[in-house]
Amino acid sequence: MNEPVIVRLTVNGAAREGRCPPRKLLVDFLREDLSLTGTHVGCEHGICGACTILFNGEAARSCLMLAVQADGAELTTVEGLMTDGALHPLQEAFREHHGLQCGFCTPGMLLTALDLLRVNPEPTEDDIREGISAVLCRCTGYHGIIKAVQAAAPRLR
């Protein structure tokens, strides 16, 4: 039961493969086996949102999933947002509107906001507040983050 298993998945558009114990968390697999350290480990209980990734296009907590559950899946981590060295429009908006301070929540916040904008391309401020409430930020007070999501919305339509 503890024999390593092969996990094959697509991460940030590239086919990836790794061997890991069957009970290894997806967040640890991403960080330790695939060297994608942008996904942060916060509470390890699915509460803080720092470990949020896109799993088959939808926001998901990677600390609540086993790596084997991602076999055959398509994942996007914060490292996958840039294209040819250029920041994603949402990342640009976060920079322009001071949507980060310490940066610990930023990867999870970006991917949560990206999923929100996929589902609701024209969110109200209340929609944004509700959508990002799944990610805890202890530094910004959320004002810059909300402004950044508002600014990014028309760029992504």
Residue ranges and their predicted role:
Residues 1-157:
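Signature of N-terminal electron-transfer/Fe-S-associated modules in redox systems
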